[in-house]
Amino acid sequence: MQLKFKNGKFRILQVSDAQDLQHVRHTMMRMLNKAYDDLKPDLIVLTGDNILGNHLNDCELWTPLFVKDKPSEMKAMGVAIDKLISPIEERKIPFAMIYGNHDDRNRMTKDEQADFYRQYSCNIGLDGTDSGDCDTYNIPIYSENGDKIKFNIWMLDTAWHDKEKDECFEYVKPEAVEWYKDTSAKLKAQNGGVPVPSLMFQHIPMLETLELIEECDSADKDAVRGPDNKYFKLKPECQGHLGEYVSAVSQKTGQMEAMKESGDIKAVVFGHDHQNCFTGVVDGINFVQTPCASFRCYGNFCRGVRVFDIDEATGDYETFTLTYNDIVGKSLWNDLCYIWDADDMVKKKIALIAGTAGGLLAIGAGVTLGLLL
């Protein structure tokens, strides 16, 4: 499938950390479906932790545990992925995906899981045979007449689960960096010696992201707790919200040097940190952090999606985020749905249930007293 600019524009919708199961949280899907309809993206990128792969054996309340082996776990995985992808497929929107640190923490390999995504006609990519990982690949975006690559999307894997060691590794593999350098050079050569402007998506933030935060006093209104009981906030030149300390990859493998050498990266875009939503610049490259979409995990008021609008003529982009309330609107019903489905709203949910129960008891007592009188 060839992606093309339309009237000089191309819109990407990023959904990060959808992180759900076969029993999907309906509030997230309602938010995403409305975002798809309202924003009309040319491409949807799912940037990791698309499913909660290490909890596929979880069950609904009052139902027995039904995932006991690989075939049943694979079935649960297929249902979870279908709940996320079917709305995209129904709208015939091209989509691309990468894995996060939760997707393959189960009995399935990444390639086995990729087969579920590949069965959808709107899937782009997952063909990283040269890069070493199925979810490390690039997506060219062509001019409207299809004769020239005008922009490029890089998708890089940052986490994988070693089944034998039962251990998760979190960094960009050195061979992936080499693949990026080689492929970027080929695209540059095809473009008359000029780097093809690009966005790079990966799940876990680069270690260089830590250069965008600074230590501060615990009393600072923007402070978040970090290692060694120290507190941090975004540097003044950054824009957005720091809701938690940056959880970056475990090691550097030459990625930053490769990006600067290649000269094609307009921005590198991350997910993973559910409560962070900010942008900043490191060594001339834009760093973009996108919050989670999931309700089956911790999060905050930033929960939503991110949009990238790319201009064909300049190769530049504009980006913005939309929160749950931006997308579905502000109303009592939408607020109740949010409280009911979001894992970080458990205390409010309990208070809501208790308050409702107390109100019903009071009404019942009043009716009973009225009958007695």
Give a label for each model feature.
Residues 21-23, 52-55, 97-108, 161-164, ...:
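Active-site environment of divalent metal-dependent phosphoester hydrolases
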Residues 1-28, 189-195, 201-214, 218-248, ...:
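Mobile, glycine- and charge-enriched loop segments
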Residues 1-78, 82-83:
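N-terminal active-site segment of His-dependent metallophosphoesterases
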Residues 1-2, 138-147, 246-247, 253-262, ...:
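Binuclear metal-dependent phosphoesterase catalytic core
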Residues 1-4, 65-194, 258, 307-309:
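Extended active-site neighborhood of metal-dependent phosphoesterases/phosphodiesterases
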Residues 350-372:
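Hydrophobic alpha-helical topogenic segments used for membrane insertion/localization
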Residues 39-43, 152-154, 166-274:
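His/acidic metal-ligating clusters that form di-metal
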Residues 9-19, 150-160, 201, 286-292:
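Active-site-proximal beta-strand elements of phosphoester/diester hydrolases
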